[in-house]
């Protein structure tokens, strides 16, 4: 919005409009306005979701001067609207009205960040660009297999309907930039292109969360790629290359689902769950390795070794 208010909406099923049996608080208020009320604490229950501690939107409200939630529970025929003010110091009583059970469900949340407290004048172009990038992330990792999900930003649909189209946004179309793609099952998919400037680059997701710094999931896939490529090159070229010589040529795109993932911080930039606890396995195929080699990785790695040997000679 022009005044810096941020709005998010989802036209899936609404939130149950009922009081929580244990806390005697309306469930939407509990979800959005009370800290540490997540249902994802129980580590004995295997989940492949991103949220865990129940902070999320509550932190947004704490750093906002105003917030509002709306949801339609079409099963109960109810609409719920509630406002929050003063950095979550004030939680207004909800307004609950009856609606026809034929009403389309939805959930909408909005908040106006406390720009003064954050030392900002408002949203700048870089922040808006980051929001748009995150919306593209959501479109890329959303399951479109059952029903095509439309994802939009500022009233414009995002032209991303799967992970491969997301890769296109980084490296261009397949005609512009060669890349190799593979998926083993619904929990693992990945693509490799040549890294710009021969510097390893990764774009990865765990349970829909963008892990900017990578993590054990990236190490898991890259470990297989570098090890298998080293063996492949040694067999065909009789040259030993280092895993580093392979890695620095690769740009990896990875999307995976991991059971009860853990991260090094609340920002969830780095996933540190060991591979033994992923809840699934992924084996990079020999065909995928051969295609990466032919992408140019093998020739460059061999050239680097030969250049080093000539320099030493």
Each language-model region and where it sits:
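GHKL-type ATPase core
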Residues: 2-22, 38-169
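Helical mechanochemical/support elements of P-loop NTPase systems and associated helical scaffolds
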Residues: 4, 24-28, 51-59, 63, ...
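Active-site-adjacent bridging/hinge elements
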Residues: 5, 29-40, 108, 191-203, ...
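Extended active-site and interfacial segments that coordinate phosphate-rich ligands
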Residues: 13, 20-38, 81-102, 125-134, ...
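Non-catalytic alpha-helical coupling and interface elements of nucleotide-dependent molecular machines
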Residues: 13-17, 33-40, 64-72, 114, ...
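GHKL/Histidine-kinase-like ATPase module
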Residues: 92-96, 129-140, 144-269
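Extended, well-ordered alpha-helical scaffold/bundle regions in very large, multi-domain proteins
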Residues: 243-311
